[in-house]
Amino acid sequence: MENNRGGYRQINKSLNICAFDDYLKGQTANLPVIANVEQLTPRVLRILGQNPGKGTNTYVIGTGDRRIMVDTSGGEPEWAELVASTLDSMNIRLSHVLLTHWHGDHTGGVPDLIRMYPELKSSIYKNKPDRGQQDIADGQIFRVEGATIRAIHVPGHSEDHMCFILEEEQAMLTGDNILGTGTSAVEDLGSFMTSLKKMYDQNCALGYSAHGITIQNLPMKIGRELGQKWRRERQVLEALERSRMHSVRSLAIKDVVSQIYGESMDQPTRTLTLEPFIDEVLRKLAGDGKVGFEMRAGKKQWYAAQAKKQDLKAPLAVQVQVQEIIL
């Protein structure tokens, strides 16, 4: 299998990839063990990505000799070897390769796939495709024996993020929007919450995530994610309202974090996780017209733009989804 050994890593230059790898390892250290290769259902085969943490899940979909692959891990040589040996042992050929989004831990294996299977060069699909790739449109259908896959555009984690609905199983391949365990990083919180509602409305029972175990109750998981994001919005608004009541006109992000989480968290958690997340919440609230900012000493200071009770209530869609979960 040595001739199948490859390796490629697409790196976002704004990201400290070493720190992110360490973060993934720490976050996933106590998660359930996932087999390198597992036939989850007669239609769904999962191959583990061999990248940091528990890895990125690659899915091979269908029941015949030609099947569809979703995501390609991060380009680790071990992944390429595992894919080649698995497909060979099962007499499987790939007809399409679908990428949920551009992040390197999902697209990094593409060069190895093309090297091993040159016929796939014109069969790599992604929303906002790179050169040589094919576009994916919202609602586009892909078919192989035993599987009908419908693509939906659900941005937020990234602008190009797609999920894929496996119609025969009433299941969704959720990419990074909904994880098997934990919660996802978000590029645009407003778009992300709109996308979660769109995902919820597809009425899929099962979720195959790009990271972690299978999600057995996808509507509940989505509802909890929406509720958690809304609660953070409410906490931010309440923190800004409290500061105004104490004659403090505006707060820096670090002060908003302190009001919500206290002062006891370690500095890496504060600066690498909490402050970026609260910054995203504030930017969404600004887009909603609920907060504003002023510049002081060259830095943004945030304040509540309105003091209406309805701003502290969950949106109707979230209330309905949470109520459905309770019932």
Regions found by a protein language model. Name each.
Residues E2-D21, G26, E241-L327:
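C-terminal regulatory/interaction regions
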Residues G6-G7, N51-G55, R67, S73-T148, ...:
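Active-site HxH/HxHxD metal-binding segment of metal-dependent hydrolases
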Residues S14-C18, P129-G132, H157:
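Glycine/proline-rich low-complexity segments that form flexible loops, beta-turns, and polyproline
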Residues N30-M90, C163-N177:
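Conserved beta-strand hairpin/beta-sheet module of binuclear metal-dependent hydrolase folds
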Residues R43, V83, H211, V236, ...:
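Residue-level signal for inorganic ion chemistry
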Residues R67, G74-E76, T148-A239:
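Metallo-beta-lactamase
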Residues T100-H106, H157, H211, V281:
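Histidine-centered divalent metal-coordination motifs
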Residues G108, E187, T273:
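Residue-level signal for the nucleotide or nucleotide-sugar donor/cofactor binding architecture
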